[in-house]
C-alpha cells in the first residue's frame, strides 16, 4: 500500500521542477485572477502523479511471474475557482461535484489475470459504475483474495460480479456526517 500526497495545495510543491510543463505555475495567490496559475500547478501535480503511477506499474510489470495489482483512487477532488461561486480546495460547507468526482485506476499483471481472470474482467465491467472510496477496502481485500466474514463484502468490491451498482452512496460533509449522493442541486 502506497499513500501519495498527490494534488493538495500548494500544488507547485507536489512535483519536481522538471514536471512543470504547464506555466506559469506559481500558485501562491488564491484569487480568480490567478486561476490560470492554480490550474497549471494543479495540472502539473496530476502529471507527476500519473508519472509516479506509470513508474510503479513498470516496476510491477518487471516482476513478470508475480501476481500483482495496483489500485489507485484519489481521496477527494478539488474546487479550483471553477464557476461563479469561486470555491477553492475541498471540504466546503456545501460540497460540489468537483470535490466528489475523482479519478481511479486498476492495473493487473498478466500473471494476476491468468490466476484471477474473473476479477480483472469484473473490474473492466465495473469501470464506469458509481462508487465511493468506501469500495477501496473491499476491493483491495478481494484483489488479495482475503475473506473476512461479515466485514468484507463482495457487493462493495469493484472486482466482483456481485458489485451492487444500485447501492446508496454517501459522502462525508465538512462536519464528518454521511450525506446521501446524489443530492438535488449538487453541481
Kindly give the residue locations of the regions a language model identified.
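Catalytic domains that recognize anionic headgroups
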Residues: 1-187
Amino acid at each position: 500500500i502506497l499513500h501519495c500526497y498527490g494534488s493538495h495545495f500548494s500544488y507547485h510543491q507536489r512535483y519536481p521542477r522538471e514536471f512543470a510543463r504547464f506555466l506559469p505555475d506559481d500558485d501562491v495567490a488564491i484569487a480568480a485572477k490567478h486561476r490560470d496559475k492554480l490550474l497549471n500547478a494543479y495540472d502539473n501535480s496530476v502529471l507527476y502523479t500519473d508519472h509516479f503511477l506509470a513508474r510503479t506499474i513498470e516496476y510491477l510489470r518487471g516482476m513478470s511471474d508475480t501476481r500483482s495489482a495496483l489500485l489507485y483512487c484519489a481521496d477527494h477532488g478539488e474546487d479550483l475557482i471553477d464557476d461563479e461561486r469561486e470555491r477553492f480546495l475541498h471540504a466546503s460547507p456545501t460540497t460540489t461535484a468537483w470535490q466528489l468526482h475523482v479519478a481511479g485506476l486498476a492495473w493487473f499483471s498478466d500473471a494476476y489475470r491468468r490466476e484471477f481472470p474473473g476479477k480483472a474482467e469484473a473490474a473492466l465491467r465495473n469501470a464506469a459504475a458509481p462508487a465511493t472510496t468506501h469500495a477501496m477496502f473491499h476491493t483491495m481485500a478481494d484483489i488479495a483474495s482475503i475473506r473476512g466474514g461479515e466485514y468484507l463484502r463482495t457487493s462493495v468490491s469493484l472486482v466482483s460480479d456481485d458489485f451492487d451498482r444500485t447501492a446508496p452512496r454517501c459522502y462525508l460533509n465538512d462536519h464528518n456526517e454521511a450525506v446521501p449522493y446524489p443530492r438535488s442541486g449538487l453541481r
